[in-house]
Amino acid sequence: MTVFKTAPLLIAALAASSCGGGGSGAAVDYDFNVRPSYLNDLRQASYDGAGNDLLTGGLGRSGLQDDSPPGYAGSQPTAEELRRNAIYVNYRALVDTTSEGGYGRLYGPNVDAQGRATSGEGMVAGTEAIAYSDDGSGRRNVTLMVQVPDAFDRTRPCIITATSSGSRGIYGGIPTGEWGLKRGCAVAYTDKGTGAAPHDLQADTVALIDGTRTSATLAGTRAAFDAGLSAADLAAFNGATPQRLAFKHAHSGQNPEKDWGLSTLQAVEFAFYVLNERFGDRSPGGQALRTFTPANTTVIASSLSNGGGAAIAAAEQDTRGLIDGVAVSEPSVQMPANAGVTVQRGGRTVAVNGLPLIDYTTQAHLYQACAALAPSLASTPFAAAFAVRFADPAFPVAANRCAGLKARGLLSAATTAAQAEEALARLTAYGWEPESGALHASLAAFEVAPSIAVTYANALSRASVQDRLCGYSFATTSAIGAVQPTPAAVTNTLFATGNGIPPTAGVQLVNDRSRGVPVRDLFSSNAAGVPTWNLEGALCLRSLVTGTDAAARRLQSGLDETRRTGNLQGKPAIIVHGRDDALIPVNHTSRPYAALNRRVEGAASRLSYIEVTNAQHFDAFIGLPATLPGYDSRYIPLHLYLNRALDAMYAHLVNGEPLPASQVVRTVPRGGTPGSAPAITAANVPPIAAMPVAADAVAITSGAIAVPD
């Protein structure tokens, strides 16, 4: 616990008074600040908080809210232009930036550390250091970054981790970093071996650490990601499969998720190095000393989604006492196989819980597009538009998916409507909460399950881009789905505009096994010429999870490398999760993890679980009322509760305040007309209670969790 940690300046003063004093002539054994051996390609920049800054890339609150992204002066974007756009895109991808949704009033750059909305732009002056973590081979090249605000308090030093969400690049945790910057904390980021910039195999160009592009030959070991093909293999691949792209998460061959905890811990180590280089005391020879250490610096591991899972992994794997506490939102955590925990809601036992992401996502990939046509979901966001787009007689791809599942014996109902209801029931039986059903149509329309299933199957299998696992590849396509060359304007900006997991920023999933020629997955046809949204590809991916052949064993072996233990080593932790989450369902992640942690740690467990009603995974979708009407009237911003969890953890570690008890926070939807919901108020988002009323209390015992309705 960080309370009573001795301030580094006091330690320095004590050391000065005890070393070399009294004329003893004794030699002083200085504790020099040593650069971690894995750091490569280190570079630093300073930002004045006026023309440019750490948090908003010089855009300020207003610029981040502007629907028009920053421009580029020429066809070859500069590193600074890419940085600014990456901050803009990633912030808006993770946060609702509409005023009606709370931006600028309840959260956002201009809302200070005490939650007060100011009239300023919220820009943060400071320094930014960025480097690779690698063994010198250039094959790993995980990006690490440390932002140190000028307001960093040397007397109360703190570090917050903000590991990237999803498969995003280094700025993919910037909304979490915002909390730390406002507190005067250093923020430790890592892309955890993922990232948005691809290897363009046809052009043989790659991105450098700053997003600018060059040839793979010139980049050498400085490439953020190189697919690692020999010249002969690259030529053969391009000849047989032209115009394809390789992405780091899918195609690095590293199974990066197994090291997400390590990458986060290395980001913290990098932060200590940067702090000591900048603020540490100096030896008589001018060398920086290890003034800031885990013993005197408060460190909170945080972030959301995959970044939240990385924070939990880091806390489990922390052998040096680097991390004091954890505060995360909707973490993706892979439970042990056959964890044997019990999850209850409202007194009813959840039959299926604790499955890994690749398992439940390949199940969603099979059934979600069909389930989205269920009549019981007709009033949910995007359901009507989904039916028009994907069940129209001219393009009945979702209805054909239902029929294809029936033909395979995976559904039994006779009509499309009944098949859709059956598909929905199968998802609910597989661990999705009933409230999650309202999100199936929009997630299916955005091809969320296929994108995750393809990337993670490749990653866990350590597949090469050459393997084209289950017949999938990545490419830019035309309006009718034909593979085409990726325009330089797309490739050169993907570092900023992409999310690292196609479909993204114009790059699509391609079905290389489509009848005739490879075509965009959505438009592809089976051997009989029927468009089924590539049911065969979905079944292939599913077989890697459930099968026993060599390909399945490879994936399953990689999956086992990513499973968590539940042992947070007694560290205090707060997990916040939206009950309605349809991407990372609570029954497979946060709920069973809390039960596992209590079984592993027993009375030493200090984990609080906060489940938020009317909250789901994609806050940014709330800010798209014209595209996704109904998100605004149904859902509140979960990001606000991550901020509150961080507030509570900081108060616990620094001031000794008790952690909030595990509970359900009952929010109030904005209501009104979908697409034009009234502005959110504080009444919609009640605080996390220090001690909830009995009806809201979550009971966690050894291997079991009971959540009230």
Curated annotation (Swiss-Prot):
One of its GO terms (biological process) is butyrate metabolic process. The lineage of its organism: Bacteria, Pseudomonadati, Pseudomonadota, Betaproteobacteria, Burkholderiales. Participates in the degradation of poly-3-hydroxybutyrate (PHB). It works downstream of poly(3-hydroxybutyrate) depolymerase, hydrolyzing D(-)-3-hydroxybutyrate oligomers of various length (3HB-oligomers) into 3HB-monomers. Pathway: Lipid metabolism; butanoate metabolism. This is D-(-)-3-hydroxybutyrate oligomer hydrolase. Belongs to the D-(-)-3-hydroxybutyrate oligomer hydrolase family. GO terms for molecular function: hydroxybutyrate-dimer hydrolase activity. The active site is at S305. Disulfide bonds: none annotated. Residues 58-77 are annotated as: Disordered. GO terms for cellular component: extracellular space. It comes from Paracidovorax citrulli (strain AAC00-1) (Acidovorax citrulli). It is an enzyme of class 3 (hydrolase). It catalyses: (3R)-hydroxybutanoate dimer + H2O = 2 (R)-3-hydroxybutanoate + H(+). Keywords: Hydrolase, Secreted, Signal. Residues 1-26 form the signal peptide. InterPro entries: OHBut_olig_hydro_put (IPR016582). Its EC number is 3.1.1.22. It is found in: Secreted. Pfam families: 3HBOH.
